[in-house]
Design a protein with these regions (language model features):
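Histidine-rich, glycine-flanked metal-binding segment
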Residues: 3, 10, 14-57
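Divalent metal-coordination and catalytic microenvironments
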Residues: 8, 29, 53, 64, ...
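Metal-associated gating/positioning segment near the N- to mid-region
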Residues: 54-120, 138-144, 207, 239
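Active-site mouth loops of central-metabolism enzymes
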Residues: 75-86, 153-170
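Short, acidic/polar
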Residues: 86-92, 165-175, 229
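Divalent metal-dependent hydrolysis catalytic cores, especially in the metallo-beta-lactamase
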Residues: 87-114, 125-134, 181-194, 222, ...
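Alpha-helix-loop-beta-strand connector modules within alpha/beta enzyme cores
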Residues: 124-126, 133, 201-221
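Conserved small/polar residues in nucleotide/adenosyl-binding loops
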Residues: 252-257
């Protein structure tokens, strides 16, 4: 199937100025040509979409999404069945694609089945890179303990993300990689939504973080860290992680350290 998108302002994403009257030709699932209408011939068998008055641009990449997080209503969360929450998540994934996001890093909550369902065309959605779990220390940002004395699993289809000490972390990292994670995510600071910690307190030692980095490297994978406070960011950098998520301090401050 061949499709031509015509008449719209075209942003190629190559650093050039927008093209006022652009044409994009798509053959199958590949962009065959893109540029000014005068330079891009339209195949005779193409289905044409008139984009006049609109802007056409490449798909966007969202580097931090949680496709399975919708409601903050804890009572409702506990009343929903896991299957209901999974089916509701497919709506979020479809909405993400409808926003023009064609690739996304899923930062915990979705297992490999979400990624494979999209890849096989079972549900519409962006290409996903998944972390599966957000690994956390006891009492950390990913430990969903509440003062009533219970642990509330945010996603009943996933195992507990809590691990303490190098060997527990090593084992849990091995598990998420076995389960199909594209990268590993751990928490090196608290978070603004946590019940039992503060966003700026450090979590995990450098040694513990480095174990995660080394284990992921054995599989050719990287480590992303949830890090909001300065101390947690410094520890993550010392352990040579691959990305800092949130990073609520200035770049100048970090560079000075």
């Amino acid at each position: 199937m061949t499709t031509a998108i015509t008449g719209g302002q075209l942003i190629t994403g190559l650093g050039t100025d927008p093209i006022p009257n652009g044409t994009v030709v798509i053959v199958g699932d590949r962009i065959a040509a893109a540029g000014p209408a005068t330079d891009v011939p339209i195949p005779t068998d193409a289905n044409t979409i008139d984009a006049s008055g609109h802007t056409v641009l490449p798909g966007l990449i969202d580097c931090h999404v949680h496709s399975t997080y919708r409601a903050r209503d804890v009572k409702q969360h506990l009343l929903n069945t896991p299957s209901y929450n999974i089916l509701r998540s497919t709506q979020i994934i479809e909405e993400t694609l409808a926003c023009g996001i064609t690739s996304a890093r899923e930062m915990s909550g979705a297992d490999a089945g979400f990624r494979e369902a999209i890849n096989e065309g079972l549900i519409p959605g962006p290409r996903l890179q998944i972390a599966i779990l957000m690994i956390s220390q006891t009492g950390g940002h990913g430990d969903y303990w509440v003062p009533a004395g219970m642990h509330i699993p945010k996603r009943a289809w996933l195992r507990s993300p809590v691990a303490d000490g190098p060997e527990e972390i090593r084992k849990l990292v091995r598990h998420v990689l076995m389960a199909g994670a594209d990268f590993v995510k751990i928490c090196t600071s608290g978070g603004i939504t946590s019940v039992s910690d503060s966003w700026d307190e450090p979590q995990y030692t450098v040694e513990e973080i480095r174990v995660a980095v080394d284990e992921a490297a054995n599989k050719g994978k990287g480590v992303a860290v949830h890090a909001e406070g300065t101390s947690g960011i410094k520890r993550a950098l010392e352990a040579k992680v691959h990305s800092i998520e949130h990073g609520s301090v200035s770049y100048t401050h970090l560079r000075a350290h």
